[in-house]
Amino acid sequence: MVLDRAKTDRDVYLIFQPGEETGEGAKICSELINEKCIGEIYGLHNIPGHAIGNVLVSGDTFACASTGLEISMHGTPSHAAYPEAGKNPGPVLAKLLLDIQALTQEVNEKEGFVLMTLIGMDVGSASYGVAASEGVLRLTVRGEREAVFDSYLRRINELVVSAAAGEEMSVDIEEIERFPATENHPENVQRLIELSLI
């Protein structure tokens, strides 16, 4: 291998990370990283559409922070003939989605790149004599910078709690498969550029 001929002055480990999409592989790899006191990590990732042997370098964020959000709102059931007697989360979740879209645009304009994707919304069931009393809004949210992403998530949580309280409903917010941002360090990027020119 090339590394055998390079005669490096320190050990180099090539690690294959399984389970990339769920983060499970990172847990396995972290044991070796800690055990061997590995101080620098360079990730290799295939990028479709680019020729084999090309080295693409990002001087900034390679992958955004992300998490799934499952927002479960709990109202009060009522007969479909008397919807005013219950609390239906449908309109609240619909407005909440629009409010989160507006927040996303505001953060993009003032603080940094964030993205919200609607994954799904379920309200009520196919019981036509009963007004909906349960609803779930599912989103995936992303952010280029960890600090901006954390602030964005806090503000989404505040919107959710406020929306539920305003209609006297209870709410649960669950984060699903949270991933940190992959932000590159400038000195490592420069080293990689220099090595790719050899």
Regions found by a protein language model. Name each.
Residues 1-2:
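Active-site alpha-helical elements of protease catalytic centers
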Residues 91-198:
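Metal-dependent amide/peptide-bond hydrolase catalytic core
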Residues 6-120, 124-130:
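Histidine/acidic-residue-rich, glycine-tolerant segments that coordinate divalent metal ions
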